[in-house]
Amino acid sequence: MKQIFIGIIRFYQKFISPMTPPTCRFYPTCSHYGLEAFQKHGAFKGFWLTCKRILKCHPFHPGGFDPVPDKKDDKVNS
């Protein structure tokens, strides 16, 4: 399932993004953030993180450096 989302993002990057001026307020860009989120966290959490990021990408948010959070280890280290 995550490969479908990654394919959609890559399609956007290759065919749609070059036709529009760069407007993302963040680094990495929202599409690169989405790719990394899906690769690190899988389909469900990657989708959630990408949606949250896209909703923050508007003129009233200052933007800046906003990396994908690291995957938390579910194991408890003793």
UniProtKB/Swiss-Prot annotation:
Cell membrane keyword on record: yes
UniProt xrefs under SMART domains: Haemolytic (SM01234)
A GO cellular-component term linked to this record: plasma membrane
Pfam families: YidD (PF01809)
Bilayer disposition of the protein: Peripheral membrane protein
Alphabetic keyword roster: Cell membrane, Membrane
TM region positions: none
Disulfide bonds: none
Localization: Cell membrane
NCBIfam families: membrane protein insertion efficiency factor YidD (TIGR00278)
Family membership noted in the UniProt record: Belongs to the UPF0161 family.
Role summary: Could be involved in insertion of integral membrane proteins into the membrane.
Protein name per its UniProtKB record: Putative membrane protein insertion efficiency factor
Source organism of the structure: Bacillus anthracis
